[in-house]
Amino acid sequence: MTKIMTSIIAFDLIEKGDLSFDEKFMISENAWRLSQSGYSSMFIMVGDMVSVEDLLRGIIVVSGNDACVALAEGIAGSEEEFAVMMTSKAKEIGMDNTNFSNSSGINDPDNYSTVRDILIMSNYLIKNYPEFYEMYKEKEFTWDRTGGDPITQGNSCLLYTSPSPRDIR
């Protein structure tokens, strides 16, 4: 659920012209650390310059926690400030029982929501960003690592066993 709002914040900024898919963010040690933690990861490296588009695909396709932190830091300067933006957006769209404490959803008791609020958020994404919603149907993507070979990553979830997949996370 947290990664949905992380994506929505980026989509809002792209739509307003304040952010572009081509903009690149330098990967911090903080973001990189999550790629080494055993959590879902895009496997970004400290110092990599990664585009917003690739970070979004890393979040949407492979559920990359490191990509969430990199995007949050690139947009807001810190994950904490980004979480404030997320909670503010949640209230703006009618999510009355939700609070965000980080951009990835990694365990934190201050990161919570309700089924109703998650439905509101999911409907907001589908209604307001149908062109970006298509990313949620992708099975894999390839991105160019700074100074390294391109990396192809995929999503191996059961989503693709259904004839009409619908997945948001």
State where each predicted segment sits.
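Single conserved hydrophobic/aromatic residue that forms the stacking wall/gate
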Residues: 160-169
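Active-site-adjacent loops and short helices of periplasmic peptidoglycan-processing enzymes
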Residues: 1-119, 126-127
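Residue-level detector of alpha-helical segments with a strong bias toward transmembrane helices
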Residues: 13, 144-147, 164
